[in-house]
């Protein structure tokens, strides 16, 4: 007989005490930006299926059920509770949240004491270990079926809560575990169906989002007893069979057997004192066994609860699984623009399939758990990676589910669906290309088919045009939305039509940016080269856009010297930082992009596409002509770059500003050249000198290396201008990219020191599971839930090279 044991929590998991309070958490830099405070835990849910977050305090407080939109608010009635009574002893009972509701509701409940146990997280698994209160040893492991290479289960809107209970005493203990849930069907859709876009105080565009929070009219709860499964299903009266956004179901369930007693109450008032379920549960761990499917009246709230009671003998261990699932199959963008979610490819699209997902979860959760372990253990057990990096590698993947993530149902054009992660909640547009230059390394290595799908969407967007005029937030100028041939900054926003209407951001005129076209070419070649070098059709899909956008970018080479010039207004990823003339950053990316285009073209000449529709008549002649032209541009640019910008210690910011700032990411193009096995942009001796200068000036000289690498400071670590914004920020994802570059150039020890500093900034200061773009030297942050921080997987790649 298989012996049941308590789970072994990996030592690498991030941990804090249950109910941790933060004395001085970092706070947001701009008041208009999002700052939900530090009480964030690991999300649960599938990629693109919506997710929920359960904090280290034990409450469910993050709700990303409506694709692309963010709600942070605790629902106290969504909660576990535990009753324990040793034989001949006193009973004790607690709701497993350390924070009582602020509105005074559920006043009959007893709330778990702060500090009695620990919370651990190693995405996609997390654990609550309860200590010092109960006589039994009690651990709840939480996870969703997300693991590398899973293009099916990783999309499931399912959360598993596996309870492990061990009796270390010499007497039997009666235990009861209760799960309560509030019916929120219908809440998660925007009540404001408007395309109005406003400009915030930081110049970035924002649209209004107001969920139908608390609108439970017509909601009803049902007890489901299905063979050995028992649970509560949360539904809503709706008109017609076709679900709209926000329509669907929630459910939770557990398994039962003769050793377990099941109790239920399917309709209680979560805004009252909670006595309907608490009094019985606190008395003996039971519930009144009350069923009521009456739909909720206007202003009424309803919740349901199930309790499982059992006796555990001395020295024995028991496991009790609870499965929570939701089925909201439709994501609506602009009014009438609807997409089905990826999981509907496996469970249907009518919004009535939540119980099928519950059954799947109860049947397969052990297998899912093992799949996650098999994926994680080679990294956790390897001596190649420091322990703090193992923790951060997995926990930064929280954004795969919590990044406002979209993953649509498959189509003939997109056989694994379309995919997108927001730049962040404050900058609410998808897959910003400059950001994903580093931020896409996780998707590349873990879900390469999705990474290619994103780049194919950019390829389709490049030849499009949108002449709609807009006001630019940075300077008030007017500009068109999207120029034909320009690589778009992003793939659009949740309030319009992602993938179809690109270039949502209007803080700068991104048609003028000098890095985006190069970024596109580099990522196309990278995605081919680092995923097996056998998907020539992917290159064929993107080739025409490679050619078109390089021609577009060359149009900014006003003196025809071989390198496009920056125009003075911020026109690259550091979009509050003026570059003028030839710049080290954009010039290096341009040279490496041309090298990549030459490689792509030669691959296509040698490899006709599998899909004949991808190759036009005369394609070979057109490719050959493009290669001749690109080679000419490349040779002229190469001759110029080093001699124009090198100052003996590092590459100058640009040729037009006269600045002596050391730009930390100045050799991003050289990093990509080394990554892709391309000819160097600059010789290795200059690379090493530059990296040593960056390490000294931007890290050690910037507040003694306390925060990480600053984007741009003078050689002594001081500011060029005291009121600079981007230059004086430490960007998490940029730091991770630079560290990967350092590792490739023999500075592993220094690089890992930098990365550990940044990781500690995140996880020691209340920024866990909301990693920001930027940290400042005055303990503030900007742009939480940021995509670029997934660039920590570039460090993983560099350590494996």
Language-model segment annotations:
Residues 2-25, 31, 127, 132-135, ...:
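Acidic/polar, glycine-enriched structural segments that form the non-catalytic walls/loops
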Residues 415-420, 491-512, 565-583, 648-655, ...:
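Acidic/His metal-coordination segments adjacent to aromatic residues that form catalytic metal sites
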Residues 433-463, 519-522, 540, 544, ...:
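Active-site core of glycosidic bond-cleaving carbohydrate-active enzymes
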Residues 81-86, 91-104, 167, 215-219, ...:
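Aromatic-rich carbohydrate-recognition surfaces in CAZymes
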Residues 1-88, 93-96:
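Beta-strand-rich N-terminal accessory domains
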């Amino acid at each position: 007989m298989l012996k049941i044991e308590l789970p072994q929590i990996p030592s690498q998991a991030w941990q804090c005490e249950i109910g941790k309070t933060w004395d001085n958490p970092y706070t947001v830099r701009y008041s208009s930006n999002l700052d939900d405070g530090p009480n964030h835990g690991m999300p649960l849910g599938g990629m693109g299926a919506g997710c929920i977050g359960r904090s280290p305090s034990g409450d469910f407080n993050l709700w990303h059920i409506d694709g692309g939109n963010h709600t942070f608010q605790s629902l106290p009635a969504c909660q576990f509770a535990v009753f324990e009574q040793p034989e001949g002893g006193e009973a004790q009972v607690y709701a497993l949240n350390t924070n009582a509701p602020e509105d005074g509701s559920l006043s009959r409940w007893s709330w778990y004491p702060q500090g009695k146990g620990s919370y651990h997280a190693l995405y996609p698994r997390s654990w609550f270990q309860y200590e010092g209160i109960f006589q039994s040893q009690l651990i709840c492991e939480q996870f969703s079926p997300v693991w590398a290479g899973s293009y099916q289960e990783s999309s499931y809107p399912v959360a598993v809560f596996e309870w492990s209970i061990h009796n270390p005493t010499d007497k039997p203990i009666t235990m009861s575990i209760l799960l309560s849930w509030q019916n929120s069907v219908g809440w998660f859709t925007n009540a404001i169906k408007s395309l109005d876009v406003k400009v915030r105080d930081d110049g970035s565009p924002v649209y209004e989002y107001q969920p139908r929070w608390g609108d439970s009219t017509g909601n009803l709860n049902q007890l489901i007893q299905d063979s050995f499964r028992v649970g509560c299903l949360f539904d809503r009266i709706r008109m017609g069979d076709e679900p709209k956004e926000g329509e669907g179901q929630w459910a939770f369930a557990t398994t039962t057997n003769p050793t377990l007693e099941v109790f239920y109450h399917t309709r209680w008032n979560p805004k009252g004192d909670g006595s309907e379920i608490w009094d019985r549960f606190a008395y003996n761990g039971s519930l009144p066994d009350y069923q009521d499917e009456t739909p909720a009246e206007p202003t009424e709230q309803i919740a349901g609860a199930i309790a499982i009671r059992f006796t555990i003998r001395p020295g024995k261990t028991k496991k009790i699984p609870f499965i929570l699932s939701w089925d909201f199959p439709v994501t609506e963008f602009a009014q009438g623009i609807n997409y089905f979610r990826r999981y509907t490819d496996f469970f249907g699209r009518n919004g009535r399939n939540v119980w099928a997902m519950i059954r799947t979860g109860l049947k397969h959760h052990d297998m899912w758990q093992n799949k996650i372990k098999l994926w994680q253990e080679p990294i956790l057990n390897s001596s190649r990676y420091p322990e703090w990096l193992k923790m951060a590698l997995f926990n930064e993947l929280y954004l795969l589910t919590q990044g406002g993530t979209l993953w649509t149902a498959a189509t003939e054009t997109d056989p694994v669906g379309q995919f997108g992660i927001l730049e962040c909640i404050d900058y609410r547009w998808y897959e910003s290309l400059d950001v994903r230059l580093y931020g896409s390394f996780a998707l590349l290595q873990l879900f390469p088919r999705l990474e290619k799908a994103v780049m194919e969407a950019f390829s389709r967007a490049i030849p499009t045009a949108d002449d709609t005029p807009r006001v630019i937030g940075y300077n008030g100028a007017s500009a068109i939305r999207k120029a034909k041939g320009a690589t778009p900054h992003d793939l659009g926003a949740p309030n319009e039509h992602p993938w179809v209407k690109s270039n949502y951001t209007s803080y700068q005129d991104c048609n003028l940016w000098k890095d985006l076209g190069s970024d596109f070419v580099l990522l196309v070649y990278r995605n081919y080269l680092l995923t097996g070098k056998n998907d020539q059709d992917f290159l064929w899909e993107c080739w025409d856009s490679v050619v078109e956008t390089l021609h577009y970018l060359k149009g900014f080479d006003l003196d025809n010297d071989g390198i496009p010039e920056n125009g003075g207004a911020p026109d690259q990823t550091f979009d509050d930082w003026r570059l003028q003339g030839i710049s080290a950053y954009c010039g290096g990316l341009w040279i490496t992009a041309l090298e990549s285009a030459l490689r792509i073209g030669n691959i296509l000449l040698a490899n006709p596409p599998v899909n004949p529709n991808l190759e036009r008549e005369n394609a070979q002649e057109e490719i050959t002509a493009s290669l001749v032209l690109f080679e000419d541009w490349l040779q002229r640019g190469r001759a110029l770059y080093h001699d124009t910008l090198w100052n003996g210690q590092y590459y100058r910011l640009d040729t037009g500003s006269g600045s002596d700032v050391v730009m930390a990411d100045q050799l991003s193009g050289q990093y990509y050249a080394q990554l892709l096995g391309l000819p160097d942009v600059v010789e290795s001796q200059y690379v090493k000198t530059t990296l040593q200068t960056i390490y000294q000036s931007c890290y050690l000289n910037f507040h003694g290396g306390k925060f990480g690498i600053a984007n741009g400071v003078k050689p002594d670590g001081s500011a060029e201008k005291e009121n600079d914004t981007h230059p004086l920020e430490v960007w998490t994802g940029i730091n991770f990219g630079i560290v990967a570059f350092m590792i490739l150039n023999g500075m592993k020890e220094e690089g890992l020191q930098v990365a550990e500093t940044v990781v500690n900034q995140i996880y020691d200061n209340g920024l866990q599971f909301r990693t920001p773009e930027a940290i400042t030297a005055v303990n503030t942050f900007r742009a939480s839930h940021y995509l670029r921080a997934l660039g920590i997987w570039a460090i993983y790649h560099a350590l494996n090279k």
